[in-house]
Amino acid sequence: MKISLGCDHGGYALKEHIKAYLESKGHEVVDCGTYSTDSCDYPIFGEAAARKVQSGECERGIVICTTGIGISIAANKVRGIRCALCSEPLSAEMTRRHNNANMLAMGAGMIGKNMAERIVEVFLSAEFEGGRHERRVGLLDAIEG
């Protein structure tokens, strides 16, 4: 699977860890930055990663900042993006199964590397259930106008 990654300075170390983890599992990664721990603005990198998913260049995206909140908000401003902030595997599974989320946000200050790996693995392997959830996702998409 081709996956976009984005982070700010607070998520840099975890992004680099997840990047290596994904590549070790055979995934192709598009790293949208940031590329250091120098202070930067999370909306830039949340949007950049989301645009890769929006365009179809990437199938899914993962964004990381200290809490995951700001960067998830940034990603969700991009039309067609459903980015869910997850801190444990069950939320990652359910957001794929019920919300057809195409992006995952995590907070580097909230979870460790092992938990992040578990969340990512579940997020990438869970499938959308469709059915009644298809209608609900359609209603979400309609809000975008």
List each model region and its residues:
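A short beta-strand-loop structural module common to alpha/beta enzyme folds
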Residues: 28-39
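Short active-site oxyanion
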Residues: 2-3, 58-61, 80-82
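Glycine-rich phosphate/diphosphate-binding loop of Rossmann-like nucleotide-binding domains
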Residues: 5-24
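C-terminal binding/interaction regions
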Residues: 4-6, 10-11, 89-145
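Charged helix-capping and loop-helix junction motifs
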Residues: 43-47, 87-88
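Mid-chain, well-packed structural core segment of small domains
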Residues: 63-64, 69-109
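Short, structured active-site "lid" loops
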Residues: 45-63
